Amino acid sequence: LPVSKDTFCPLPFSHISTMPHGEIKLCCRAQPPMDGVNPNVKNEDFNLKDYWHSEYMNDIRDDLILGNKPPQCSNCWKMEDNDIVSLRMNRLTDLMDKDTYRKPVEHYLINREVEFKIPLIELKLSNVCNFKCRMCWPKDSSKWVTDWDKVKEFYSEGDQDYIEEIVDGNNLRKTRVMNLYEKDEYFVD
């Protein structure tokens, strides 16, 4: 494929991610667009298909193919600058072995469109989770709620308000969180 291996990422051609409050992202690590707002699937005028075919997604795809580094992908660029294997690098190797993204990219290069057949999708429908991973936080894991009051000063005011909304909206301060999964095989990488 005629793409720059230094910047190319297969995720915008093969993946989409949502947040518990309905926000749609090009991947779980992506920063918001330049206007600071990701579309929300809970908005009746917008859906995953619209996002997948949006000019925003096509601009990101173009940048990655042409060797540019979109700011939305800065988390991966920062990791790579520090000699850490990023999600982009992992998925490039992983998906290359499975040939998951070759056809969508070839189709895109000809038509500037990726078919709405998303092979990898991450749907976060709520923040209820029975794990407390170190890289996570209350937006994505209810197990972090008990620690939130101790660490919230390290987050921005907007994040604090949003997390407080989740905590209070789900009555998580008073309710014990149920474990949803009892075995590891419920989780798919």
What is each residue range found by the language model?
Residues N82-P119, F131:
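Recognition helices and adjacent regulatory flanks at domain boundaries
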